């Protein structure tokens, strides 16, 4: 309305109802997961999946996630989170700043130095968000990144975001340390502590690691 260029994401009509109907089969999904992955809690996995899908279908929830990341990275020299325009957004419509730039695939045509710089930006975004904000963007793929004309990397999809407590992030750090130390027993202990693995799951430590 004021002449700004914007990007508009519109939810396909009926998609929420269709997905909800599919998720009604969650008991069957849980049973199959229990057979394939006997060391995991299948019902917990299915409930987590259901919660994340419901959140991803709610564009007001996504707008709130964008706000968290945009506030944190505002002014960052390498990372751009396009801000939401709330008066043009709703549960099924999300309107943000427009990003002038190229699709992420264009990185393959750039110099090795530029590719290294962009890779470092992605790495820093993921782990800084997790370790400082206790948030994780759960949909990291090239379609959700843009190479902005000003040199920054723009991140454009925040429908699938997980928010953690500080102690949960510390447990993830313990998992990573165990992997780096090649300590299979410690890796198993931490995996059980964070409920990724059932206690006494029918696998050896080395198989889990």
Residue map of PLM features:
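Conserved catalytic cores of large enzyme domains
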Residues: 1-209
């Amino acid at each position: 309305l004021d002449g700004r260029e914007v990007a508009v994401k519109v939810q396909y009509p009926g998609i929420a109802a269709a997905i909800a109907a599919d998720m009604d089969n969650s008991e069957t999904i849980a049973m199959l997961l229990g057979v394939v992955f006997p060391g995991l809690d299948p019902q917990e996995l299915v409930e987590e999946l259901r919660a994340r899908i419901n959140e991803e279908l709610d564009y007001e929830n996504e707008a709130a996630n964008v706000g968290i990341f945009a506030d944190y990275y505002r002014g960052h020299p390498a990372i751009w989170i396009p801000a939401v325009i709330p008066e043009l957004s709703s549960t099924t419509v999300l309107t943000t700043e427009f990003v002038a730039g190229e699709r992420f695939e264009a990185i393959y045509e750039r110099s090795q130095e530029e590719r290294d710089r962009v890779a470092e930006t992605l790495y820093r975004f993921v782990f800084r968000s997790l370790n400082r904000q206790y948030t994780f963007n759960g949909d990291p793929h090239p379609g959700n990144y843009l190479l902005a004309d000003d040199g920054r990397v723009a991140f454009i999809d925040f429908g699938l975001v997980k928010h953690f407590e500080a102690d949960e992030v510390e447990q993830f750090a313990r998992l990573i340390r165990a992997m780096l130390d090649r300590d299979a027993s410690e890796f198993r202990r931490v995996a059980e502590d964070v409920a990724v693995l059932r206690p006494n799951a029918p696998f050896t430590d080395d198989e889990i690691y």
